[in-house]
């Protein structure tokens, strides 16, 4: 998957590359429920203009990184759907595989993987996130 991170030319650390190797080396036989979860992620990403896979719900995030991602999106006025990956372990693992990204939260806008909390924070601080969300048409308009 061609993520926003890689489109803007960011490089991954050696640690991330080694983590990806271990994950690909240790992949287990996929259960039917896992395959279904992977299909569900693909469908959700395709059908949702802006979706955040997170731990918890926006009103009650269950980890600091998910909280950060939610607060950033709210500060930008983004209209987004969320999915609590803690409800389903197959879904949590499917999200990680789909985005080829080892951590949660994960944000997708118009089918494109944007990143996790740290990347969102960097994009937010630089103003790039505002531009990206506005261009995607996922920001609430003042009436």
UniProtKB/Swiss-Prot annotation:
Function: Monothiol glutaredoxin involved in mitochondrial iron-sulfur (Fe/S) cluster transfer. Receives iron-sulfur clusters from scaffold protein ISCU and mediates their transfer to apoproteins, to the 4Fe/FS cluster biosynthesis machinery, or export from mitochondrion.
Gene: grx5
Residues noted as binding [2Fe-2S] cluster in the record, renumbered to the chain: 63
PROSITE patterns, per the entry: GLUTAREDOXIN_2 (PS51354)
Entries under Pfam families matching the protein: Glutaredoxin (PF00462)
Protein name: Monothiol glutaredoxin-5, mitochondrial
Binding site for glutathione: 55, 92-96, 104, 117-118
Keywords in alphabetical order: 2Fe-2S, Iron, Iron-sulfur, Metal-binding, Mitochondrion, Redox-active center, Transit peptide
Primary residence: mitochondrion
Subunit structure: Homodimer.
GO cellular component: mitochondrial matrix
Cellular localisation: Mitochondrion
Domain Glutaredoxin: start-end pairs: 38-140
GO MF annotations in UniProt: 2 iron, 2 sulfur cluster binding; metal ion binding
CDD domains in UniProt: GRX_PICOT_like (cd03028)
UniProt entry tagged with the keyword Transit peptide: yes
Native source organism of the sequence: Dictyostelium discoideum (Social amoeba)
Entry-linked Gene3D superfamilies: Glutaredoxin
InterPro entries on file: Glutaredoxin, GRX_PICOT-like, Monothiol_GRX-rel, Thioredoxin-like_sf
Family: Belongs to the glutaredoxin family. Monothiol subfamily.
Transit peptide location on this chain: 1-25
């Amino acid at each position: 998957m061609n993520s926003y991170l890689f489109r803007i030319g960011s490089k991954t650390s050696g640690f991330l590359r080694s983590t990806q190797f271990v994950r690909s080396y240790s992949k287990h036989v996929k259960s039917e429920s896992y395959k279904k979860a992977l299909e569900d992620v693909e469908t959700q990403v395709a059908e949702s203009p802006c979706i955040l896979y997170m731990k918890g719900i926006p009103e009650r995030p269950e980890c600091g990184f998910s909280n950060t991602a939610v607060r950033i999106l709210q500060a930008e006025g983004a209209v987004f759907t969320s999915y609590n990956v803690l409800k389903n372990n197959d879904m949590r693992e499917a999200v990680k595989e789909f985005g080829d990204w080892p951590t949660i939260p994960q944000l997708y806008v118009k089918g494109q993987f944007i990143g996790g909390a740290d990347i969102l924070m960097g994009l937010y601080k630089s103003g790039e996130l505002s531009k990206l969300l506005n261009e995607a048409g996922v920001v609430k308009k003042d009436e």
